[in-house]
UniProtKB/Swiss-Prot annotation:
It comes from Bacillus mycoides (strain KBAB4) (Bacillus weihenstephanensis). Homodimer. This is Glutamate-1-semialdehyde 2,1-aminomutase 2. Its EC number is 5.4.3.8. Pathway: Porphyrin-containing compound metabolism; protoporphyrin-IX biosynthesis; 5-aminolevulinate from L-glutamyl-tRNA(Glu): step 2/2. The gene is hemL2. It is an enzyme of class 5 (isomerase). Its cofactor is pyridoxal 5'-phosphate. The modification N6-(pyridoxal phosphate)lysine is found at K268. GO terms for molecular function: glutamate-1-semialdehyde 2,1-aminomutase activity; pyridoxal phosphate binding; transaminase activity. Keywords: Cytoplasm, Isomerase, Porphyrin biosynthesis, Pyridoxal phosphate. The keyword Amino-acid biosynthesis does not apply. It holds the Pfam family Aminotran_3. It catalyses: (S)-4-amino-5-oxopentanoate = 5-aminolevulinate.
Length: 429
């Protein structure tokens, strides 16, 4: 049995200092019924907690660390930049270099604005869509998380297409009423929503692969249908690629599925592990953003040289061949997890998109949030705790996916499959 004495003591102290003892809710490990692990360091595919336990890491800081922890090239570049100054409140050349890379690789982006988080990116993109179209309402999908902006913290009421209800205290109902929510992968509900509210819908915002109900890829024709509906109704299509951007493919989710939106939101990978976000799209739309246009958005640390450097050094190491290798590794892990679950007759459904993998403990095919919620959460929690004992660090929620990095070796994946085999053999009864 692993010992977690130092993590337990650190969490006891933290609960007197921060809400719930953490700075982001999922880190409290509540849904898996254990004390959170306090991490001390990471290198490559491994992380080490303050009690000295080693884990193969599939959290990767919730996705950004596509080259694993403390990538040598990123670390050395950050050291060099930090010695010159961490932020200037003035433009730097590294902003140009990262912007150029993003524009070259993301099909929809002709002009890009750097911000400090994925939430900033989505909030800013919504403001831009509303300002550009002169419309008020947005359409999002149940179970898709786009950051904690008021307009996006909305859940569905009853009915096929509903005006939203706040998903958190503090979100005014008046704000929520401008958010329409429908089921992910349900194109007919989208069409119905446009029949009801189309003249006032500014945009659809969607993850090309839903990542906060587990990993849920789009059904064939779904993204293409959204593109068609928005074009027919004069609304914008926004892809939230904070999670999928440079994760599922060299050209992001839009390249992976061959559908080009009007605006794209990015984050995670483009910061190489530092706080970052970005939104971009057609030049005609992006030129409406201040100072070239009237739609305001600003940020004290936007485009700071540390985040831009980490992002640039991360992206330049990614090539089309990188994603061929990701696909091979991810297929290997997916097949191994499936084989272990089948061997022990454990109800399961595995979804994958590139190097994102989600395993659901349910018999249902998971294509939307309702299906994801059919998962056996008690079983997942027990599985999670056993995987920790076996030295594998997974996202502590059934509704989050696993991420692979270039640092993960075949030996890591084989060890993970062996750990899952042990965990499932213990839990099958």
């Amino acid at each position: 049995m692993k010992k977690f004495d130092k993590s337990i003591a650190a969490f006891e102290e933290a609960q007197n200092l921060m809400p719930g003892g953490v700075n982001s809710p999922v880190r409290a490990f509540k849904s898996v019924g254990m004390n959170p692990l306090f991490m001390e360091r990471g290198k490559g595919s491994k992380v080490y907690d303050i009690d000295g336990n080693e884990y193969i890491d599939y959290v990767l800081s919730w996705g950004p660390l596509i080259h694993g922890h403390a990538n040598d090239r990123v670390v050395e570049a950050l050291k060099a930049v930090a010695e010159k100054g961490t932020s200037f409140g003035a433009p730097t050349e590294i902003e140009n270099k990262l912007a150029q890379l993003v524009i070259e690789r993301v099909p929809s982006i002709e002009i890009v604005r750097m911000v400090n988080s994925g939430t900033e990116a989505t909030m800013s993109a919504l403001r831009l869509a509303r300002g550009y179209t002169g419309r008020n309402k947005i359409l999002k999908f149940i179970g898709c998380y786009h950051g904690h902006g008021d307009s996006l913290l909305i859940k569905a009421g009853s009915g096929v297409a509903t005006l939203g209800l706040p998903d958190s205290p503090g979100v005014p109902e008046g704000v929520a009423k401008n958010t329409i929510t429908v089921a992910y992968n349900d194109l007919e509900s989208v069409k119905y929503a446009f029949e009801q509210f189309g003249d006032d819908i500014a945009c659809i915002i969607v993850e090309p692969v839903a990542g906060n109900m587990g990993v849920v890829p789009p059904q064939p024709g779904f993204l293409e249908g959204l593109r068609e509906v928005t074009e027919q109704n004069g609304a914008l299509l926004i892809f939230d690629e904070v999670m999928t951007g440079f994760r599922v493919a060299y050209n992001c989710g839009q390249g992976y599925y061959g559908v080009t939106p009007d605006l794209t939101c990015l984050g995670k990978v483009i910061g190489g592990g530092l706080p970052v976000g970005a939104y971009g799209g057609k030049a005609e739309i992006m030129r409406q953003v201040a100072p070239s246009g009237p739609i305001y958005q600003a940020g004290t640390l936007s485009g700071n040289p540390l985040a831009m450097t980490a992002g640039y050094e991360t992206l330049v190491q990614l090539t089309p061949e990188s994603y061929v290798e990701f696909e091979r590794k991810a297929e290997m892990l997916e097949a191994g997890l499936r084989k272990a679950a089948e061997k022990h007759n454990i109800p399961h459904h595995i979804n994958r998109a590139g190097s994102m993998i989600g395993i659901f403990f349910t018999d249902e095919q998971v294509i939307n949030y309702d299906a994801a919620k059919s998962s056996n959460l008690e079983f997942f929690a027990a599985y999670y705790r056993e995987m920790v004992e076996q030295g594998v660090f997974l996202p502590p929620s059934q509704f989050e996916g696993l991420f692979l990095s270039t640092a993960h070796s075949d030996a890591d994946i084989e060890a993970t499959i062996a750990a899952a085999e042990i965990a499932m053999s213990k839990l099958k009864a």
